[in-house]
Amino acid sequence: MSSQDLEQFRIFNKKLETEKDIKPILNAIKSLFDYKPAAEAKITLSNVGISNIVRCLNVQDKSNDDLTCEVLKICFEKFGVGDVVKHFTSHIMYLLRHEKNCVRRLAVDEVYKSVIADVSLLPVPEYIDIFVAVAQMVCDKDVGVANKAIIITSNLQFEAYPKVLEEMKIALEHNSSSKCNAYEVVINISLKSYELFKLSVDNGYIEHMVEELKSNDVLYQLNILELLSRLSVKPYGINYLVKDGALERITALIGDLRNNPLGGLLLPGYIKFFASIAHYYPKEIFEKYPIFLNSLFNAIESGEQTVLPVALDALGFIGITIEGKLCLTAVGSPFIQAIEKIGQLIRNSPAEIKIRALYCYASLISVEKDTPSQGPVDHRVTLMTREWFRSLNKESDAMETLLGICKIPFPDIKLAAYSLLDAVCQHLWGEELVARVAGFVEFLLDRSINEPKEAKEAKYDIIKRLSQSSVFDDNILTRFKTYVKEGPFYSDTTLQVAMEEGN
């Protein structure tokens, strides 16, 4: 900025101390800096400072608070990432604790930009007070401020957390929403390392979460279960929940749901929680916590709409792994009954349940989604999945039933049906069934069917898989390979346009 502009800012700055009507002065400062180059404005602001502007937020007349925020925002935009916090640390501390939402939002945004860009921009020893102040803002009444505080506090350097976690406990004295925000930070950092998890345990957060499951607030309980399920995927997380007895206590809560008038609302959350653990540790969960399996199978058998979608997702998530499939089949008749029930749901349910049931079935049949598995498929799995697929329709032909569902014109149902067909075609027995059912190959190769982009891509992947099969004759294999070569979106119109362009 020119020396004239610098002097003008000094005059405006001085007037903020003496004039009662500060609105025209703030507008003048706003106009002065609005279009000035950042490099010039930064020098002026660094030399003169922003104390008098900030002081405008500390007067009895609050009518100019929004305008003051606008002026400060323009000033802050002239600085690089992290520089505002470095140059005006004490001011940022004041702004973070201000009663006005827009003021706190302005300050937390500056810290957010710094931490997200490079957490090392603000060394912990120098800025620990800033980090503590932000951590306590996870219980801010302004949702935007609270959400930014969660992200910032979840991404600090390790050495900040002993102090931050200690001071963030203030959130546990607030309402359930604030406590959940603090829990979210705790889970976010606990997933990063065992050391941070241990720090969270030592500060009592995890134990507090488990105890809070006794709350009568349904949404609060479900949020806690969701967060604990994220923690349980870590070996140290599940080990703690088991050794501390937390899993036993959570299991007991499932047993109490039948006596709880809100049990129907809570059961989906508990099923989802245990399914997230059983996905990784099916054998241990099935053996030690049979009440979970009973609740899962009962939910599927009952057909209760409030819990059925989650139960179908949960069973599919458990059964997507090879170990999950083997553990489920070891359960015996309760699982077989569940499979048969899912077959009925696929055939006779409204669209939403039909789709969930199809995806559940696809997960149970598929053997390629279990990434850790290597080598040939276990022969037991081949036999099991073939038998499970027959349960799609025991009174008729299961593959003909699937063909009929694939022909349903609704895009979401068609896509789910293709997902199941793809899972079936991962097996030799599945390829043989496709070859055996009259009209199935012709249906797959028929490009005249009006299908959305996702369905065309899904069908293309199935045909690509079948083009490598040994169960079809040479003529069909040639047609499959031609289809693959032409791509998922080829049509006679495409050929006609290409020929016209060639001519």
Segments the model singles out, each with a brief description of its role:
Residues 3-4, 39-48, 79-87, 120-128, ...:
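Short, hydrophobic/charged alpha-helical patches characteristic of ARM/HEAT alpha-solenoid repeats
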Residues 246, 252-413:
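Eukaryotic tandem repeat interaction scaffolds
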